[in-house]
């Protein structure tokens, strides 16, 4: 090879992604056991709506600090060691939460979990390490399937267990699932390639400089902004839905509780399984990732707006179906577009940044949502989520058919 010829980029190492799927599935199963009851569990310690949603904000604030650092370190030492550390933190957090005797102990549990959080971004980075760019949307769909299965089984099981045995039982079960995920990672997951890219340690320490670097890249900047608005609307929804539904809807004469909320999440999870289990790959081939992202944001706008005006359980499920479709197609398609825009040696950092964007959104959105719900501004809570998704539509211009047609016409105009 000529001395002046740059070396060919290292190709992804093909490995079975089944262990990653199993690990994410177990992790998500544990997480979804807790999501439907977290806010209502906090209310059992006399928390206000704002104090309940701030449990999400505290977790996210810790995750905001740790996200880029975990990404950098995983690029150097490999994904597996950092994934194990993250999972151990989750396990300890669940144990503390289950044994809590006061509201402040719930906050301690969320700090412990958030400080080591990185399971999802590390799993995504592992998939990027071992798949070709053209296959990533389909491969990231595995994470979507895991979320779907977890959201189908976990919340439904939470509803049953909390009604029959009390609200701490699902939390203990979540800790058991976390322990199983640690064993799966230790025994099933193969070590991935380490990055030989010489990162500047000062850049790793100054996270804002890292953000400026990647947000300064055309193409990648728009995708990261889309991800920010997507995850902000999702965080507003997921952190406040239990409190919203508890105050807005009744079932068989009583307000929504963990059981009913769990069943709604279970339905959304079932839709996710159907969508990402077989449709996402065909949809990407037919329409492309950009078009799917645009369609997903449109569905979110309609779904969240409909949630605000829903006056019956049936209308709630219609709005939830649209929102589930939007979330189901945006996450894998947008993650694929982001990793394609980043260099191979930078994928851990970029996915760490997306994890930090999730954290930033999850710091602010639950506080805003908690304030709105506490003031009984339930419609405004749902419409705020719709407005955030509408910004995602505006940033999806190249994926919208009418924009593509207009662009082609303008190019052809002398």
Model-derived segments and spans:
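Juxtamembrane intracellular "pre-TM" segments in multi-pass secondary transporters
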Residues: 5-14, 191-225, 414
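Cytoplasmic helix-loop-helix junction between adjacent transmembrane helices
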Residues: 109-148
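Short amphipathic helix-loop junctions that connect adjacent transmembrane helices
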Residues: 36-49, 240-260
């Amino acid at each position: 090879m000529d001395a002046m010829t740059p070396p060919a980029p290292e190709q992804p190492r093909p490995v079975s992604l089944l262990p990653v799927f199993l690990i994410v599935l177990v992790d998500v199963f544990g997480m979804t056991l807790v999501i439907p009851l977290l806010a209502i569990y906090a209310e059992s310690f006399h928390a206000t709506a704002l104090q309940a949603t701030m449990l999400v904000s505290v977790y996210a604030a810790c995750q905001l600090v740790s996200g880029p650092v975990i990404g950098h370190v995983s690029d150097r030492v490999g994904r597996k060691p950092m994934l194990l550390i993250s999972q151990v933190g989750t396990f300890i957090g669940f144990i503390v939460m289950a044994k809590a005797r006061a509201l402040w102990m719930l906050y301690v549990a969320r700090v412990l979990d958030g400080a080591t959080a990185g399971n999802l971004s590390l799993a995504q980075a592992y998939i990027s390490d071992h798949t070709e760019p053209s296959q990533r949307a389909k491969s990231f769909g595995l994470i979507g399937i895991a979320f779907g299965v977890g959201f189908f089984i976990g919340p439904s099981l939470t509803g049953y267990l909390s009604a029959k045995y009390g609200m701490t039982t699902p939390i203990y079960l979540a800790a058991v699932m976390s322990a199983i995920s640690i064993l799966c990672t230790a025994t099933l997951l193969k070590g991935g390639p380490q990055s030989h890219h010489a990162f500047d340690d000062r850049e790793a320490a100054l996270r804002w400089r890292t953000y400026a670097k990647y947000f300064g890249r055309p193409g990648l900047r728009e995708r990261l902004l889309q991800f920010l608005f997507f995850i902000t609307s999702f965080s507003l929804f997921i952190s406040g839905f239990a409190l919203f539904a508890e105050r807005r809807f009744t079932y068989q004469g009583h307000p929504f509780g963990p059981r009913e909320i769990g069943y709604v999440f279970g339905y959304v999870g079932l839709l996710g399984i159907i969508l990402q289990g077989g449709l996402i790959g065909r949809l990407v081939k037919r329409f492309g990732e950009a078009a799917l992202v645009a369609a997903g944001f449109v569905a979110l706008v309609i779904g969240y707006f409909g949630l605000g005006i829903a006056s019956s359980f049936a209308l709630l499920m219609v709005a939830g179906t649209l929102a589930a479709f939007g979330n189901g197609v945006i996450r894998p398609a947008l993650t694929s577009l982001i990793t394609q825009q980043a260099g191979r040696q930078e994928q851990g950092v970029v996915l760490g940044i997306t994890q930090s964007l999730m954290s930033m959104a999850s710091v602010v959105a639950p506080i805003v949502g908690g304030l709105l719900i506490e003031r009984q501004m339930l419609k405004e809570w749902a419409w705020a989520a719709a407005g955030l998704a509408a910004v995602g539509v505006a940033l999806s211009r190249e994926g919208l058919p009418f924009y593509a047609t207009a662009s082609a016409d303008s190019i052809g105009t002398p």
